Amino acid sequence: MSSHTNLPSPKPVPKPDHRISGTSQTKKPPSSSVAQDQQNLKCPRCNSPNTKFCYYNNYSLSQPRHFCKSCRRYWTRGGALRNVPIGGGCRKTKKSIKPNSSMNTLPSSSSSQRFFSSIMEDSSKFFPPPTTMDFQLAGLSLNKMNDLQLLNNQEVLDLRPMMSSGRENTPVDVGSGLSLMGFGDFNNNHSPTGFTTAGASDGNLASSIETLSCLNQDLHWRLQQQRMAMLFGNSKEETVVVERPQPILYRNLEIVNSSSPSSPTKKGDNQTEWYFGNNSDNEGVISNNANTGGGGSEWNNGIQAWTDLNHYNALP
């Protein structure tokens, strides 16, 4: 008899269990099902299925945070509902500020007029109109030039066109103007000095222009003398007087007829009194000329004669 027929069948060997004691292996649901459940959640406020998963609060899987797109609010599962105001979670686009169209437009006529008027007012503050002239020239006060009256409150230059050829020629009197400028009183004491032109209107106008040009030259010369006196002092006053330029017109206007040698020359009656004023040098020259009248060296041009030459010896 064979021994192989009565052997028992072997028992199956059990598989070893690799589970660690004290721990239990839990099966996680698939991620697809979890995402589907999270997407199917409805908003607890508006019951809108239009929700989305944001993140896990405090990194805890039990507190997922969702956002409702319809009511724009957040909520957390297992937590309190937050009272988030409507529209608080959206980002509003900033509107670009359009440039003001009024800035590009030209100013109106009224604004431009106000602008130019303000400019004129500012310029008048720095450059006031010449109302009065206050010059102190060689001790002569030329204040209140507005009181200058020529031809008895009449204009010196009549620039209006003369239509008729037979119009009467008006005399041009510069006496009051010369009296105010320190050249003597011509209206009261010396009446024959009024310049009267006979002829056409062009001659009258030309003579008046020449008169004013002569006065302008004299005033300019006096200004130069004052500036030279201020710069170099009073020591060079005599030399400056000697270098005085000759004016073009009306320099030797005779005030008193002193051509006769027999008549004594008085102080202040010389023919250039209105030009030089009361100058001490002039008076000395006039008195010297009066004393040397008998010696044949009487000079009427204001230059002192050399009479005392006897003490000089002749050359060998």
From Swiss-Prot:
One of its GO terms (cellular component) is nucleus. It is found in: Nucleus. GO terms for molecular function: DNA-binding transcription factor activity; sequence-specific DNA binding; zinc ion binding. Residues 21-42, 257-291 have a biased composition (Polar residues). Pfam families: Zn_ribbon_Dof. Residues 101-111 have a biased composition (Low complexity). The keyword Cytoplasm does not apply. A zinc finger (Dof-type) spans 41-95. It comes from the Eukaryota. Zn(2+) binds at C43, C46, C68, C71. Keywords: DNA-binding, Metal-binding, Nucleus, Transcription, Transcription regulation, Zinc, Zinc-finger. Transcription factor that binds specifically to a 5'-AA[AG]G-3' consensus core sequence. This is Dof zinc finger protein DOF5.7. It comes from Arabidopsis thaliana. The gene is DOF5.7.
